[in-house]
């Protein structure tokens, strides 16, 4: 938010709702991933029983802002206002996930992080990350270095739906233990 608004982070934590601030209240009566978001002339109040509920409430709050909030450049002309609203929400399904198959098509660490950010925007809670298969081994195991030395790179990629037509370009990558 500070990047696109050109200011500092507007979130503060306090017992009382500060001017133009957000108050977070633990409410054990709400389901684990549920939340209540109340925006009125007094400020913003978020109620949840656990961390996931608070996270999903903040995602909803962010979605109430102009689309420029998802940008990477300052947008000083955007109307950085949140409309008055009352939202009570909880997921219908416990498992809400997406599959990322890096065994067949490698994604950089930054791309994986962006993928997870987009999952969070949509309040998905499970990443099914396919790290190994015949097409690639994508995780470093220091005891078995040949897994990545050999298994992380393929000699060529099929360029058509016809078997036997390859581009001749080596392709691949893997994630280090530090990453």
Segments and roles (model prediction):
Residues 91, 135-179:
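Aromatic- and acidic-residue-enriched carbohydrate-binding clefts of CAZyme catalytic domains
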Residues 50, 98, 119:
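Conserved, mostly hydrophobic/aromatic
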Residues 40, 100-101, 166:
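Acidic/histidine-rich, surface-exposed loop or edge segments in extracytoplasmic proteins
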